[in-house]
Amino acid sequence: MKTYNIIKGIFAATVLSVVFSGCSEDAMDRINKDHGHTQSVAARFILTDVITSTAFSNAGGDFNTYLSAYIEYEVGVDNQLYYAETRESEPTSSSTFNNTWNGLYSTLKSARIIINQCSEGGIDHGNYVTKGMAEVLAAYNCALIADMFGDAPCSQAALIDENGSPVYLTPKMDKQEEIYTQAMQYLDDAIADLQKEDLIDPEAQDLLYQGDAEKWLKLAYGLKARYTMHLLKRSANKDADMEKVLEYVNNSFESAEEQAAFDVYDANNINPLYGFFVARAGLGASENMRSKLAEYND
């Protein structure tokens, strides 16, 4: 009888340990999941971030600040802008455009997330206009990469899997020409998508055109004209490409009022170039720029 009770006790303990082990594993599975943050966001909300980072950080950040000195729109008079002005170290320093380099790929990643979510099988499939907006922004950021860095990662960069991890940890280097090809393909796709419909209007999230697909379409054609002109010296048929430029221009903006202006700045949200000037006073008026304006009576 004593032996029976011992065996019974061991069996019960074993069963309980299995039960508690199972419960413990289930509990750990729940604990290990981040329930405090969303796992996915509607594409139209990501759009706001892509527009903002493109305008503020990528087009309006260090590129804008340093290039204004390099092309003599402004003069670097202090600290790093002085070194940029005198070409002592800033043009070749790996840290000069480090922040913008990271920003470009982060923005491109977000644009590609929108495109994937709005494509067939995605959680936002059917929102073709939103997809087209993201394709325009992806093209713009790809072209910034090509213009500023020449050969660079692009086709395999800024791609994530379903878990949010990079698809390629060491993406291949693309030729500058290949990056431009990708940008033009994005614009072709955008032109097709922007002429379709959205299931949900992104008006409130679109900080450029308040959901106006026609204006985004004009922006896409304007960028096609710009990038075709950028490539004219490598063109196999310049006359034909110039005809394309005229065609794209005819489908683009009719006045300055239609330009893609990121017009959200105020006293609390200042333009990054002005913010840099106020914080560091590193830029001064350019004599060359003044002379050109006087020459053209502008």
Where are the regions a protein language model picked out?
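Sec-dependent bacterial lipoprotein signal peptides
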Residues: 1-21
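Alpha-helix C-terminal capping/termination sites
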Residues: 55, 144, 148-151, 230-238
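Conserved, well-structured interaction surfaces
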Residues: 79-152, 166-197
